Amino acid sequence: MEGISHRTLLVNGVNIHVAEKGEGPVVLLLHGFPELWFSWRHQIVSLAARGYRAVAPDLRGFGDSDAPPSSSVYTAFHVVGDLVALIQSLGPDQVFVVGHDWGAYMAWWLCILRPDMVKALVNLSVAYAPRNPGRRPVDACKTIFGDDHYICRFQEHGAIEAEIAQIGTTLFMKKFLTYRKPAALIIPKDKGLEVSLETPVTLPSWLSEEDINYFASKFEKSGFTGGLNYYRCLNLNWELTAPWTEVQVDVPVKFIIGDLDLTYHTPGIQDYIHKGGFKSAVPFLEDVVVMEGVGHFINQERPHEVSDLIYDFIHKF
């Protein structure tokens, strides 16, 4: 695709596939679930044209990267370990980082654990959430949303994979990537994914059949367990990060979110983002952009605007 090159690097004991294009300062692009490097296809081309070296890995567990079988090796420490080794293999002492969804979560922790390696961060959709020492995150989801919240359902080893297999990878990708309800995603056990996620009559203009087929072809090979293991490590992350309770993120940050993103409608999140809590936890937060009429998969839905927002921030450094 438009001169994007691919290679596999052995980093931190796992083979990580990366897509890259361009020369100049490195911009590391980190995807979420259920996604791949391909989610950044538009930003890779745009950033390369503007004088940057855009590098988008398949995170461990996804796509053409290794997917270790144990669910306990998908913690923030394992994934950040991959990212540190990847950055070191790319050469520069510091990189720009852009994250979305789980990629944003891991980018926050990269900045906490190795702020020396990050020039500046642009994160999409997932705001930094300081550790709550009084409640494990999955327990919090159950309390707020009930046992059928998608994060709770994703904890069940094998069960959600079986539901995905029942409807098929291609249909699951269509349903998940086009989910646009500004509310919590609930997957009742008695109804499952088939009913809980609507099937689009037609794909939106930003997502083609070819795009869906690319995603589906990779997940057909890799399966979904690697990606789901990120959710299954949420409570383990909480346990392991106890020494970092009340830590701040001390790198320059820009945050972008869509007003139809389900994460923007988590109870209390808008007050946190806009009324000082976020800025307190991320003191070098320079800008928050709320894009109107945009759902969760913001970098694909509004590729040119997101690319411009990224460039407008990082070119200052």
Tell me the role of every PLM-derived stretch.
Residues 29, 56-57, 99, 123, ...:
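Conserved SAM-binding loop
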Residues 283-317:
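Catalytic active-site module of serine/aspartate enzymes centered on a nucleophile-bearing elbow/loop
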Residues 33, 37-40, 102, 108, ...:
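Signature tryptophan residues that serve as conserved aromatic anchors
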Residues 2-5, 15-16, 26, 62-98, ...:
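Flexible "cap/lid" subdomain of the alpha/beta-hydrolase fold that forms the substrate-access gate
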Residues 14-67:
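Conserved HGGG/HGGXW glycine-rich cap/lid loop of the alpha/beta-hydrolase fold
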Residues 1-7, 316-317:
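Basic/polar N-terminal segments that are highly enriched at the extreme N-terminus
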